[in-house]
From Swiss-Prot:
Organism: Candida tropicalis (strain ATCC MYA-3404 / T1) (Yeast)
Family, as annotated: Belongs to the eIF-2B alpha/beta/delta subunits family. MtnA subfamily.
Protein name: Methylthioribose-1-phosphate isomerase
Subcellular location: Cytoplasm; Nucleus
Record site: Transition state stabilizer: C177
Active site: D279
EC number annotated for this UniProt entry: 5.3.1.23
Length: 410
């Protein structure tokens, strides 16, 4: 189904009729098209092709796809052939669709724990279905609840930080990729903090000496999630923002930090926070997130070390549910980094627009010399040394101790 009506509902699961539809995020912001997911294979392809993305969202879609797959199987007349062993193999296969994001692996491993109560030779039955259904519903509901808690906890951290710095006036926040409703069950993680902060600290609402004036989403090459998705969400919610390319970050921070405007119709509001999501946070706090996140942390560190006094210091915040924390992996060196196809870097895909801005057919346009060598990792790892805080649904925000170490818990 397709329309031009805008929506922030990335995952639609019909709990009565057991149907799963996902918003095809490859077509945003120009088209709102939902794809039906009826099998585990459907989910694998949607996740692999990034029609759905964001660590929490792909975990939820993965779990719901198993529910729908089993439900449809049990409706068949000949439903005595599928064994637990086959389902376990399907789960292992589904995990490989996006190996860096720990949420998907965690969810599917939880389902494998459910299956350990059965013999591999057992036939898939209604009891197994109901247990996986209940788990998946809980996963979805808890993610939404946790995202709202992340937003509130991030807001409190921002308020306390600015008060401690005795900061006054307008400030800005920078982010990368998409970490909002389109990447989760709703509200979002990093973008959820931005939502909560703007609602409480926009100029007309703020009871503090400071207010959130502007958001700067990075374009997020090569897949452009910041340009396509985060801008879509910010515009939808009427949160003031200006899109920038990934290679404009240093110049923007420097300009605003030197009390200069970047546009005549904007105030001077220094970037005080860079808030990012996470696909995996390991035991020491090293964080895998969208490629380009690491460089944001090094830029913030440069300005904090060499350029800015405390009033203009930039806090680098990671926002993620505790399901993203991986205590079994010691450091970021052990994280498997997914590499994407070369054509995602050497081509651009999007609809043609005529002079009136009307949307036409989707086309692929080359932007690089054909056949060249390309390196296209989907993620990088930000060292914990460059992270100021990790905000989860726990009201106690994770900050480093006197030795510069995080002590993370699940």
């Amino acid at each position: 189904m397709s329309s031009h009506t805008r929506t922030l509902e990335a995952i639609k699961f019909d709990r009565e009729n057991i149907k799963l539809d996902i918003l095809n995020q490859l077509l945003l912001p120009y088209s709102t098209t939902y794809i039906s997911i009826s099998t585990i294979e459907d989910a694998f392809q949607a996740i692999k092709l990034m029609q759905v993305r964001g660590a929490p969202a792909i975990a939820i879609v993965g779990a719901f796809s198993i529910v729908v797959d089993i439900f449809n199987y049990l409706k068949l007349e000949n439903n005595t052939s599928k064994k637990v062993k086959e389902l376990i193999e399907s789960l292992d296969y589904l995990i490989t669709s996006r190996p860096t994001a720990v949420n998907l692996a965690n969810a599917l491993n939880d389902i494998k724990e459910i299956l350990k109560n059965y013999n591999e030779s057992d036939i898939i039955n209604k009891e197994i279905y109901e247990k996986i259904y209940n788990y998946s519903i809980k996963l979805y509901d808890e993610d939404l609840s946790n995202n709202k808690k992340i937003g509130e906890n991030g807001l409190n951290y921002i308020i306390n930080t600015l008060k401690n710095q005795k900061f006054k006036g307008p400030f800005s926040i920078m982010t990368i990729c998409n970490t909002g409703s389109l990447a989760t069950s709703g509200h979002g993680t990093a973008l959820g903090i931005i939502r909560s902060t703007y609602e409480s600290l926009k100029k007309d609402n703020s009871n503090e000496d400071f207010y959130l004036d502007h958001i700067y989403p990075c374009e997020t090459r090569p897949y452009n999630q910041g340009a396509k998705l985060t801008s879509y969400e910010l515009d939808y919610e009427k949160i003031p923002f200006t899109l920038i390319c990934d290679n404009m970050v240093s110049s923007l921070i420097n300009t605003l930090g030197n009390d200069k405007k970047i546009k005549n119709d904007q105030q001077i509001a220094p970037v005080k926070f860079i808030i990012v999501g996470a696909d995996r946070v390991v035991k020491n706090g090293d964080t895998a997130n969208k490629i380009g996140t690491f460089q944001l942390s090094t830029i913030a560190n440069y300005f904090n070390t060499n350029k800015f006094d405390e009033n203009k210091q930039i806090k680098f915040i990671v926002a993620a549910p505790k399901t993203t924390i991986d205590l079994n992996t010691e450091t970021g060196d052990d994280i498997i980094i997914e590499e994407r196809p070369a054509n995602e870097l050497t081509t651009l895909v999007g609809p043609q627009l005529n002079q009136q801005g009307e949307v036409g057919e989707k086309v692929t346009v080359g932007v690089a010399t054909p056949g060249i060598s390309v390196w296209n990792p989907a993620f990088d790892v930000t060292p914990h040394e460059l992270i100021d805080s990790i905000v989860t649904e726990d009201p106690n925000v994770f900050v480093k101790d006197a030795n510069g170490n995080f002590t993370l818990t699940k």
